[in-house]
């Protein structure tokens, strides 16, 4: 596992999530004041990056117009990726 600064556009987010808008607003305030404190988790498979958590952090960062996100990147097998896509 490694922690990296990644372009938001490079992360595939295949699952639709329901956002708590109040939580996104609080995160926007905190991120603009203190920066991103907790990385999201990303799976890397065959050169592609897949994000399955951190939807509120990602939404806050996108709405702030920031181009990158801090992420813990873990290599994944095809089986691991399939499990997350269910």
Where would I find each of the regions flagged by the language model?
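Short, charged/polar connector segments at secondary-structure boundaries
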Residues: 1-75, 79-86
């Amino acid at each position: 596992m490694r922690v990296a600064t990644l372009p938001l556009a490079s992360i595939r987010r295949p699952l639709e999530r329901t956002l708590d808008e109040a939580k996104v607003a609080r995160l926007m305030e905190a991120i603009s004041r203190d920066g991103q404190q907790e990385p999201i988790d990303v799976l890397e498979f065959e050169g592609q990056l897949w994000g399955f958590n951190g939807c509120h952090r990602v939404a806050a960062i996108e709405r702030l117009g920031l181009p990158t996100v801090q992420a813990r990147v873990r290599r994944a097998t095809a089986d691991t990726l399939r499990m997350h896509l269910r």
